Amino acid sequence: MVDYSKWKNIEISDDEDDTHPNIDTPSLFRWRHQARVERMAEMDHEKDELKKKRQSYQARLMDVKERISKKDGDEEALKKELEKIEAEGKELDRIESEMIKKEKKTPWNVDTISKPGFEKTVINKKAGRKPDENLSEEEREQRMKQFVKENEKLCQQYGMLRKYDDSKRFLQEHLHLVGEETANYLVIWSINLEMEEKHELMAHVAHQCICMQYILELAKQLDVDPRACVSSFFSKIQHCHPEYRAQFDSEIEGFKGRIQKRAQEKIQEAIAQAEEEERKERLGPGGLDPADVFESLPDELKACFESRDVELLQKTIAAMPVDVAKLHMKRCVDSGLWVPNAADLEGDKKEEDDSDDVAGGEEKTDDAKSESAAKEEPIYTGVSTEDVD
């Protein structure tokens, strides 16, 4: 047979309870609930006090018994103290018994009438890492340009931060920066800073770049979105084991070394490109470099071009074998060191000038004649030692 007596004494407010017309029912329920909560808080406080006294009693009891067994001190005084402590223990037992009886007589209420039979915890699944999109090189380059155009200032602000807490807060406020694009931008910026010989600033930006790369690597290991790993990484790096920190610092040093190497390569490439452009600008009509051609000439021909002596050049060419002379002169023409048929061109110009002078009834002076004679000589371009250097 089921005993329903325990359900007779329940302190639960009911909307159908009879109350005085002048008393607001909701207010009455609130007062009752407040009084019940205060009684429960007082009961819990009494339990805590009793527990503390019980612990103190047991510690003192063990201490006195140990001292009596070791005969440490006045035996009579110790026995009296033991009797006193045991009396306190009996009093504590009585208080505990009364408290249990009082608790049993306490009516059930909405807070004590039931207990949870089981609990269920639901943990949200972390956001999965976005799969790498199959983009062509042109599309990736276009996306990178658009990202830099929209977020270059933010990337530079992140690269200049020094404290981990500041970096964590900044990335959490700008989660769209957590990605490969930011890491790539920081790499390029580090190379440019190294090329500008801003070594300390490069080292700082390199540190921030490695932080971003560690976040991305952590996301790959956990197979989650990188934005979900920002807090985890900075918490880990601030309270990490010495081995992890040493590995992190080693990665930074290796990265800085690669940046310095790449910067030197780009500088050499820029120098080589500038030299190539300069060489192309001075190429002759045949596509040969006059400096290279000049260096390949025999010493006697070099002396002719350096002294700009046409007669000496003609004598030197006449003294050389025909095949060798043709080869050298062809190279001089292709490089622009020598301009062929210059005398004919200048001669035609002279005849035109002479006809103009005759029509005007003017006679040439000795100076004009000497100038005309000079124009009959072939024209060539010389090469100075500065061009060779």
Swiss-Prot record:
Subcellular compartments: Cytoplasm
Basic and acidic residues bias: start-end ranges: 1-11, 361-378
Keyword Glycosyltransferase attributed: no
Region (Disordered): 1-26, 342-389
Keywords per UniProt: Cell cycle, Cell division, Chaperone, Chromosome partition, Cytoplasm, Developmental protein, Meiosis, Mitosis, Phosphoprotein
GO molecular function: heat shock protein binding; insulin receptor binding; protein kinase binding; protein tyrosine kinase activator activity; protein-folding chaperone binding; unfolded protein binding
GO-annotated cellular components: cytoplasm
Residue positions, PTM Phosphoserine: 13, 296, 355
Phosphothreonine, modified sites: 19
Lineage top rank: taxon: Eukaryota
Cross-referenced PANTHER family: CDC37-RELATED (PTHR12800), HSP90 CO-CHAPERONE CDC37 (PTHR12800:SF4)
Assigned protein family: Belongs to the CDC37 family.
Function of the protein: Co-chaperone that binds to numerous kinases and promotes their interaction with the Hsp90 complex, resulting in stabilization and promotion of their activity. Required for cytokinesis and chromosome segregation in mitosis and male meiosis.
Subunit composition and interactions: Forms a complex with Hsp90. Interacts with a number of kinases such as Cdk1, sev and aurB.
Protein name: Hsp90 co-chaperone Cdc37
Organism annotation: Drosophila melanogaster (Fruit fly)
Lineage: Eukaryota, Metazoa, Ecdysozoa, Arthropoda, Hexapoda
Gene: Cdc37
